[in-house]
A protein has these predicted regions:
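C-terminal motif of bacterial Sec signal peptides marking the signal peptidase cleavage site
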Residues: 17-19
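C-terminal substrate/ligand-recognition segments
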Residues: 340-442
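Conserved, well-structured interaction surfaces
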Residues: 40-49, 53-59, 84-163, 179-187, ...
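Long, intrinsically disordered, low-complexity segments
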Residues: 83, 117-118, 191, 257-322, ...
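An aromatic- and glycine-enriched ligand-binding surface/loop that stacks and positions planar moieties
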Residues: 21-87, 197-198, 216-373, 494-496
Length: 553
């Protein structure tokens, strides 16, 4: 069995050292070991476990989606203002500005996943071939093949959402060829659908989100993937399968991201420091004051939510707040209406005075957490440039004095997303009434309880309501940037704008001055070519049947 070094694989792919065909070449393995593995179900399960470590790469705790940090940092939602770490602070800004870094080679380094993903596809196909040659019962073969095909479907989904086309390989290893053309986009999505349908039909039905994959996980991924190819009937079909499985929204929004008592999670990946599977999300994004209060050097706050995102949240009674008073470059002493905003705001964003770890957040100049001006102030480390910090997904109980590694789970799929996927498919089928009903299910979570939507009677109005709900409900779950791309609105929404924050100064007593500031040195820019990422040069060098996409030539 090979040892898995996924970080090394990503680095190698990012540096252009590998092509997919290098990974797909069949190399010698220990035949005795492989034979033993596929002669026993329990050891075969251990072999399949290899792929589970890739599930978190769907989301925000790793750098698979973007080697330079959260993809939200490429949008109006999040600002990387900390200059301590070049790749995770400077680079996302350059990508969002479409700076000189957006050559085909550098785009592949920071956004591409070609080489590492094809390596995993090759390994899945090898495993399926060995499984088919085993003497396992039909039931065990079907279950293990379903797990493997879930992963293959997941890998091809990640390729197609970036490149629109892929080279399709299956478990017939004789088809591997150094020179092989890209298959059509339609063929690629049909292949993803086939794998995920098989997985959904053959994995066990269970609401246990921990451990091995379930039918619900397969259908959840299917509902997400089919949005990208606009197969609305299959989105609805996948969602409806999940609706009958017994998942429920957690009453408290923040509980949807926790391990215990989570009725909403369809699949979560759990970390364990003993098994050395922790992550660094808290170290990167916790408020800077958390580190100093633990007796450490100021750190954290690599990126922070923007004022633009804050203004997306509704009042607890419904409708948007009027932020005109705080859109002043002269400054105002009036406190922002944080206490009037809906519960999801309080569960997602830390603001001036927010309760946190037995203290209150101080994102003001010379506060415990601090404020700094983007690209102007020295030693920004740990300080916010927007006046906010991220709360969602950050572990309030993490002890930095004990460990820099964190263990809160990554919830890969949850019911609220499925409701919104279903709503989108319904409105695309002109069923506005059902679409609005499922958006309202999310809005009326017991602990959120926003008013039902009113006067949303057209497809266009329902789509705007859906866009708002996805932006708020699914914030920082790694979906917003890709939503803008698949809707073909990124070029419009992410061009010619700048992100904003609040500069906060403590005055006398408990009074503060809030000043509206721009936190970008230039406009954001999403060039049309970014709707499809470039083929890596390493692939072009070795595969004579592939040409670079026209927009990247």
């Amino acid at each position: 069995m090979k040892t898995k070094y996924i970080v090394s694989c990503l680095l190698a792919a990012a540096m252009g050292l590998t092509s997919c065909n290098d990974f797909l070449d069949i190399d010698p393995t220990n035949k005795v070991t492989e034979k033993l593995v596929w002669n026993d179900v329990s050891t075969a399960e251990l072999a399949v476990n290899y792929f589970y470590a890739d599930i978190p790469y769907l989301g925000s705790f790793n750098n698979y989606q973007c080697a330079a940090g959260l993809t939200e940092g490429l949008t109006d939602e999040f600002k990387y203002g900390n200059l301590l770490n070049n790749s995770e602070c400077y680079i996302p800004n350059q990508i969002s500005y479409a700076g000189s870094i957006l050559t085909s080679s550098y785009t592949d380094v920071y956004m591409g996943v070609w080489g590492s993903t094809y390596e995993e596809i090759r390994r899945v196909n090898e495993s399926i071939a060995k499984l088919h040659a085993s003497s396992f019962s039909k039931e065990n073969q079907a279950r293990l093949e379903a797990e493997l095909r879930f992963f293959r479907g997941m890998y091809y989904f990640e390729l197609l959402k970036r490149y629109h086309q892929a080279i399709i390989y299956d478990e017939d290893l004789s088809k591997i060829n150094t020179n092989k053309a890209l298959d059509s986009e339609e063929a690629g999505w049909a292949y993803v659908l086939s794998d995920l349908e098989f997985a959904g039909q053959n994995l066990p039905v269970s609401t246990n989100a921990k451990g091995r994959l379930t039918s619900g996980a397969a259908y959840a991924l299917m509902s997400r993937a089919m949005l990208y190819c606009q197969n609305w009937d299959k989105v609805k079909e996948a969602c409806e399968k999940i609706f009958g499985m017994g998942y429920e929204l957690t009453p408290n929004y923040s509980d949807a991201f926790k391990a215990d008592g989570n009725t909403e999670a369809i699949y979560m990946y759990q970390y364990n420091l003993t098994a050395k599977t922790g992550h660094s999300f808290d170290g990167y994004y916790a408020p800077g004051g958390d580190h100093t209060l633990a007796g450490m050097t100021m750190y954290g706050g690599y990126g922070t939510p923007t004022q633009d995102l804050v203004e997306e949240y509704e009042l607890a009674t419904g409708g948007k707040a009027d932020w005109t008073t705080w859109h002043t470059t002269e400054g105002t002493m009036q406190n922002p209406p944080y206490d009037k905003l809906e519960p999801r705001f309080h569960a997602t964003i830390l603001y001036n005075g927010a309760p946190w770890r037995g203290r209150t957040i101080e994102p003001f100049i010379d506060g415990k957490d601090g404020w700094a001006q983007w690209m102007k102030d020295a030693a920004v480390e740990g300080r916010t440039t927007t006046g906010y910090y991220l709360r969602k997904l950050v572990d309030e109980n993490h002890d930095f004095a004990m460990s820099q590694q964190s263990t809160q789970p990554w919830v890969a799929f949850r019911l609220a997303e499925v409701y919104l996927n279903y709503a989108e498919a319904c409105l695309r089928k002109n069923d506005v009434e059902t679409a609005v009903a499922y958006i309202d299910k999310v809005r009326q979570r017991q602990g959120v309880n926003l008013p039902k939507l009113k006067n949303v009677n057209t497809v266009d109005a329902a789509f705007e309501a859906l866009r708002h709900e996805r932006k708020v409900e699914l914030a920082f779950e790694g979906l917003y940037y890709w939503d803008l791309r698949r809707w073909n609105v990124a070029e419009r929404e992410l061009t010619g704008i700048r992100r904003h924050g609040l500069k906060i100064e403590k005055m006398t007593g408990d009074t503060f001055r809030y000043t509206y500031v721009t936190v970008d040195s230039e406009d954001l820019n999403f060039p049309k070519k970014m709707y499809r990422l470039p083929v890596p040069q390493a692939e072009l060098n070795t595969n004579k049947d592939i040409e670079q996409f026209a927009e990247w030539k």
